[in-house]
A protein has these predicted regions:
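C-terminal alpha-helical interaction module
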Residues: 1-166
Length: 166
């Protein structure tokens, strides 16, 4: 896993107060969670968008939204995936959730819910976005699939600076 290798090997170049995104004590759990995260959520949109049959679409659709329900439940009592400590898993998940909410959901047909309709996931996204490093590197401009060459910006989707507490 390239990201884990970089997190470990380049740790010495990070600021002293930067969180360790792949701490030794959580590595097994992070790896297990990421092994679940990729096929069910990170790749969920692509499984729906590029399927070759209605059967495959329906299976990917149900799996993606069932997985979001599980994730929303997990975040009911946790600020981050592993409690109060931010990890590699949070970074991987955040990127997908922001992309889904600002763009991807438009490409897969009718959807059960938007990210904004999962209260714990939505609070989690807003909480992460309120952290300076996430805000600095979250870019809301993307090419829309229905208007080639035209870019739209949607920072207001997540930029609400309402404090989020667990």
């Amino acid at each position: 896993r390239l990201s884990n290798y970089i997190e470990v090997q380049f740790r010495k170049f990070q600021p002293v107060d930067a969180p360790d995104l792949y701490p030794v004590k959580y590595r097994k759990e992070i790896d297990e969670f990421n092994d679940w995260l990729f096929p069910h959520i990170n790749n969920g949109h692509y499984r729906m968008a590029f399927c070759q049959s209605w059967e495959a679409y329906n299976e990917a659709y149900e799996d993606f939204f069932d997985s979001l329900e599980k994730l929303d439940k997990r975040l009911e009592t946790n600020r981050f995936i592993f409690g109060d400590y931010i990890t590699d898993s949070d970074v991987r998940l955040y990127v997908t959730l922001v992309r889904w909410e600002t763009s991807y959901y438009r490409n897969v047909g009718p959807i059960k819910k938007r990210i904004t309709e999962y209260p714990n996931i939505w609070g989690y996204v807003k909480d992460l976005y309120s952290l300076p490093v996430f805000k600095k590197y979250t870019f809301f401009e993307f090419p829309t699939s229905n208007a080639p060459g035209i870019f739209k910006s949607y920072p207001e989707r997540i930029a609400a600076q309402v404090p989020y507490e667990k």
